[in-house]
Amino acid sequence: MNLKTDRTFGVPEPGRRYRDRVGAYLVTEHAGHIALIQTPKGYFLPGGGMEPGESAETCIRREILEELGYTVRIDEVLGTADMYVRHETIGWFHPVQYYLRGELIHKVSVPIEEDHKMVWRPAIEAENLLFPECQRWAVACYIKRK
């Protein structure tokens, strides 16, 4: 995958075939707290993988509805990052992630994903809790821009 990103984490190991996964994630704040998704595997920004033909904005709208049951307003693109990692279940993995800033607007449905719980954490704590290094970077960029 040859998408130019703002920041790359890790270095691809020569001779390895990486599984690409493009996704979009939301950074949203309320009263100094950032929304995170708590799962059995750790903390993540709300969002997920893009489906074929989806834009980052469309992906965010779908994922936020599925994970949280909210509609969302997208304000801006914060940046993009990718990572080269060895994932415990996927193997050689290359996530490419778009980060958008926005606001949760209306609760319109019950979340579909039962093991995903939204929690609000102070911005610095949220940055430190996030599992993927690239998502920590996105929150750090958001904090610096404020």
Show which residues each predicted segment covers:
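Structural detector for helix-capping/boundary residues
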Residues: 48, 62, 75, 121-124
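Conserved Nudix-box catalytic region and its N-terminal flanking loop in Nudix hydrolases
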Residues: 29-67
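Short, well-ordered beta-strand micro-motif
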Residues: 28, 99-103, 120-122
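A short coil-to-beta-strand element that immediately follows conserved catalytic motifs
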Residues: 71-80
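Acidic, metal-coordinating catalytic segment for phosphate/diphosphate chemistry
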Residues: 1-25
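NUDIX/MutT-family hydrolases
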Residues: 110-141
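Active-site-adjacent beta-strand/loop module that shapes the phosphate/pyrophosphate-binding cleft
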Residues: 82-109
